Amino acid sequence: VEIVSVTMDTPRHRCTWRDVFRRTRQLANALTAAGVKPGDRVASLAWNDYRHLELYYAVSCMGAVMHTVNPRLFPEQLEYIINHAADRVLFIDPTLLPLLQVLQGKIPCVERIVVMTSDEAMPDAVKGKLPSYESFIAGHSDEFDWPTFDERQASSLCYTSGTTGHPKGVLYSHRSNVLHAYAGCMGDAVGVSARDVILAVVPMFHANAWGLPYNAAMTGTKLVLPGPKMGDAETLVDLMNTEGVTMAAGVPTVWTLLLNYMAQTGKQAPTLKKTLVGGSAVPLSMIKTFEEKHGVTVLQGWGMTETSPLGTVGTLRPDMMSLPAEQRYQMHAKQGHGIFGIEMKIVD
């Protein structure tokens, strides 16, 4: 089963879950050699690709805490959260290196910076000054003795913008990530299975990409990661068609761009069966367009960074399936029902 990634150094990189597991152990050894210990925070400023996926697993499984940083935040916010988290190592995508110039001298907690590319593709501005990801893991064993620790130990760290003041840090435990992965694979939730091919457009720096990297590993699902092209409709449609994508996940603005592109070009995505949409309310017109013109079911989800993050999903009950189309669309426009593990209370 493949993980397909768009990166700056490889337009269409392919690897298997076996490869990811092997390189994850190499990365864990490299981090250990760099002095990273259980409980330490390791940050990423990166898009969705296979190297970021390896970071997800290496950092958390060695007992450290994976801190995915949103590169779209204001520089002052980036400075604050990196220092607040006390990140010791920072992995950065080469396309985001200009952020380093803004942060230079302002993040003293960071002891090491690694550029997420190969030596051959290193930008001239940092060549010889910073290590590439590939040189960082090169030469390290692909065997690693994973430690045993309490399931409630911190696994990953995301910052939520909140409503006032600075962004707030939310720690995910290993337990919450595993339970969320189980819940997401249930048929009446997202229904991720080994028969799917998932296009994760939702960023890996946004609430753990809604848990999809864990769902995919749990089920052995083919995962398609669009890298820095996550907002490019032409690339997304091409990935859907060449990789046989059956399910995609992202915010409404992405799907607006995609639907407009498909309408203008006449292109289709015949293998796509459903989209998981969250982040903001889904317009009823989008639900109708997806279903009537493309045969795609829209699953609207609601959640928060604090809920790991999925809280509800809009799958239909059996008695709703026979409703007229307009009424079904109205149901899909709602936030749906709570998923396993979520306690909810409706307050008037």
PLM features per residue range, with description:
Residues 31-36, 140-152, 157-199, 211-212, ...:
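Conserved adenylate-forming
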Residues 32, 50-69, 78-79, 185-188, ...:
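Hydrophobic alpha-helical segments in the ANL/AMP-binding
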Residues 178-197, 207-246, 261:
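Conserved AMP-binding/adenylation subdomain of ANL enzymes
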Residues 33-34, 61-135, 149, 251:
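Structural core segment of the AMP-binding/adenylate-forming
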Residues 218, 245-250, 259-330, 343-345:
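Gly/Ser/Thr-rich phosphate-binding loop
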Residues 46-49, 70, 192, 201-206, ...:
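Conserved AMP-binding
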Residues 2-49, 53-57, 74-79, 129-135:
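Conserved AMP-binding/adenylate-forming core of the ANL superfamily
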Residues 41, 47-67, 71-75, 83-89, ...:
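A short helix-loop-beta submotif of the ANL/AMP-binding
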